[in-house]
From Swiss-Prot:
Transports the free citrate anion. Probably cotransports citrate and at least three or four protons. The citrate uptake is inhibited by the presence of magnesium ions. Keywords: Cell membrane, Citrate utilization, Membrane, Symport, Transmembrane, Transmembrane helix, Transport. Pfam families: CitMHS. The chain crosses the membrane at residues 1-21, 22-42, 59-79, 86-106, 137-157, 176-196, 232-252, 278-298, 318-338, 343-363, 377-397, 406-426. This is Citrate transporter. The gene is citN.
Length: 426
């Protein structure tokens, strides 16, 4: 019964936001509360919700100060030279801009953190999309697809969870996946080409100069004399993120404080800069805490466990020898409907144990489980996706509708490549 309620809750939630009946923020709060009450968990509801919000508090704090930090960097003109370089290359061609978005996203994604990837990519590319009148859903979609493929690098979250859950080594899981990952990269570039070609057909090639657009209000905020300082500060921040020098919220809080103090030493200026980015920060962070309500109820009611076991039980014994392929396919809905932690620590060991009865190595199941990551990033349970849509200025539901077929296509392409090369067996 819990499993059925869990699936119905997810379906209702998806319908409400994709049909624009409710905003994602309201749906994340109201829908799980209603279903928890129907399930008879009214007495424990408060504790579940607070636990969910508490679990996501560090993420919310990190995103708040990350938005403020990169907002200061944009105001100061840190990304202006990069935008000028990109402009000189793309020459007002939407196709080149779309492909450039894919390449930039996947390059930055090497740091293993989706938040910084979206921050830098959107900060660099959004002005170009605005100047040419390109569809921002193309920007958000390509950025998410690129991040989805690169999300399986060893220092990213999913692969680390697989290694910990199944007690495996990087050489057993990630190294064999590299050819499939390359296939995914080529697919994302191909998708960017297709979407860019559509935008070129709609808009044409537009003649623009090679300098970032001049906004009279933005000019006084530029800090060309501090360009190198801001660049070094950002590089140091990225290095600290990769090496986990300090917790992410602390790193972004510290970097923001230093950036604001150096670039805008006047207290009134500091207040204006914070106010200028407060709206964007509020939109994203409120969504994260609302997602905490959703995940808290999903976990606290044990709906997520019931959903996992019911899905695993649907796999017939006759399909046992094909578990690697089945795992690759079901990793899409599994990681969409539940968090990576729930899937990789709760469901994956069960699948791996079942596969061992058919002589299938746990490493093969681990590799297969990572192929659904491009779809996972469309889940309402992924905080960084709210940052992406917030910065790009698109609705969560529209982003899902626009990107879902391309995300599923990414998983299919990577799975076919994995089968052909022998990374996973049929």
């Amino acid at each position: 019964m819990l499993a059925i309620l869990g699936f119905v809750m997810m379906i209702v939630f998806m319908y409400l936001i994709m049909s624009n009946r409710l905003s994602a923020l309201i749906a994340l709060i109201v829908v799980p509360i209603v279903f928890a009450l129907i399930s008879g968990f009214g007495k424990d509801l408060g504790e579940m919700m607070i636990q969910g919000v508490t679990d996501l508090a560090p993420t919310g704090i990190m995103l708040l100060f990350a938005i403020l930090y990169f907002g200061i960097m944009i105001d100061s003109g840190l990304f202006d030279p990069l935008i000028a370089k990109i402009l000189s290359f793309v020459k007002g061609d939407p196709l080149k801009i779309a492909v450039g978005t894919a390449v930039l996203t996947m390059t930055i994604s090497l740091d293993g953190d989706g938040t910084t990837t979206y921050m830098i990519t959107i900060a660099a590319m959004l002005p170009l999309y605005k100047r040419l009148g390109m569809n921002r859903l193309v920007l958000a979609g390509i950025a998410m697809l690129g991040s989805g493929v690169m999300n399986i690098i060893p220092w990213g979250g999913p692969t680390a969870r697989v290694l910990a859950s199944l007690k495996l080594d990087t050489s057993e899981v990630f190294t064999p996946l590299i050819p499939a990952m390359i296939a995914g990269i080529l697919w994302v570039i191909a998708v960017a080409y297709i979407l860019g070609k559509k935008e070129r057909k709609r808009l044409g090639v537009i003649s623009i100069d090679h300098a970032p657009s001049s906004d009279p209000e933005a000019a006084p905020l530029k800090r060309p004399a501090l360009q190198w300082f801001n660049l070094l500060l950002t590089v140091a921040l990225m290095a600290a993120l990769i090496t986990s020098l300090l917790p992410l919220p602390v790193l972004f809080m510290t970097a923001f404080a230093v950036a604001l103090m150096v670039n805008y030493p006047n207290v009134k200026e500091q207040q204006k800069r914070i106010s200028a980015h407060a709206g964007n920060a509020l939109n994203v962070v409120s969504m994260v805490f609302a997602a905490g309500i959703f995940t808290g109820i999903l976990s606290g009611t044990k709906m997520v466990d019931a959903m996992a076991h019911s899905l695993v039980s649907l796999i017939p014994d006759a399909m046992g020898p094909h578990l690697p392929l089945i795992t690759a396919i079901v990793s899409m809905p599994f990681t969409f409907f539940m968090s990576n932690d729930a899937f990789y620590f709760g469901v994956l060991p069960i699948i791996a144990e079942a596969a061992s009865a058919y002589g299938i190595d746990a490493a093969e199941i681990g590799r297969a489980s990572l192929l659904g990551q491009p779809v996972h990033l469309l889940s309402p349970l992924v905080p960084s996706t709210y940052l992406l849509v917030g910065m790009a200025g698109v609705s969560f539901g529209d982003h899902q509708k626009f990107t879902i077929k391309w995300a599923v296509g990414t998983t299919i392409v990577m799975t076919i490549a994995a089968l052909l090369i022998g990374i996973i067996s049929f």
